[in-house]
UniProtKB/Swiss-Prot annotation:
Entry-linked SUPFAM superfamilies: Translational machinery components
UniProt entry keywords in alphabetical sequence: Ribonucleoprotein, Ribosomal protein, RNA-binding, rRNA-binding
Name the record gives this protein: Large ribosomal subunit protein uL18
Single GO BP term: translation
Cellular component GO terms held in the UniProt record: cytosolic large ribosomal subunit
GO MF, any single term: 5S rRNA binding
Family the entry assigns: Belongs to the universal ribosomal protein uL18 family.
Function as written in the Swiss-Prot or TrEMBL entry: This is one of the proteins that bind and probably mediate the attachment of the 5S RNA into the large ribosomal subunit, where it forms part of the central protuberance.
Subunit structure: Part of the 50S ribosomal subunit; part of the 5S rRNA/L5/L18/L25 subcomplex. Contacts the 5S and 23S rRNAs.
Length: 117
């Protein structure tokens, strides 16, 4: 099993458990150059809020989009947008990525901005 297949297996297992709970999910995806975050409805078929480093408003504030500072900016933006829509409690879905570095920076920034998970 290669590295990507192992990550996808971990992500699938976690998502199955979150779906059983019926929780609103904060989903994170990262690439070497960008980081993406979405808040997905409990039924899994609707994206309620999204933010990423590819957005012009976030991208203009950053020198580089593939670091912890960029992840923190996305975390703050996703939390602010979720709170505007009345979403306070979410379950953190790290998509099989290690809770370390950019994923952790995004989560910490979202918590500081008011999301609870």
């Amino acid at each position: 099993m290669d590295k990507k297949a192992a990550r996808i297996r971990r992500a699938t297992r976690a998502r199955r458990k979150l779906q059983e709970l019926g929780a609103t999910r904060l989903v994170v995806h990262r690439t070497p150059r960008h980081i993406y975050a979405q808040v997905i409805a409990p039924n899994g078929s609707e994206t309620l809020v999204a933010a990423s480093t590819t957005e012009k408003a976030i991208n203009e504030q950053l020198k580089y989009t593939g670091n912890k500072e960029a992840a923190a900016a996305v975390g703050k933006a996703i939390a602010e947008r979720a709170l505007e829509k009345g979403i306070k409690d979410v379950s953190f879905d790290r998509s099989g990525f290690q809770y370390h570095g950019r994923v952790q920076a995004l989560a910490d920034a979202a918590r500081e901005a008011g999301l609870q998970f």
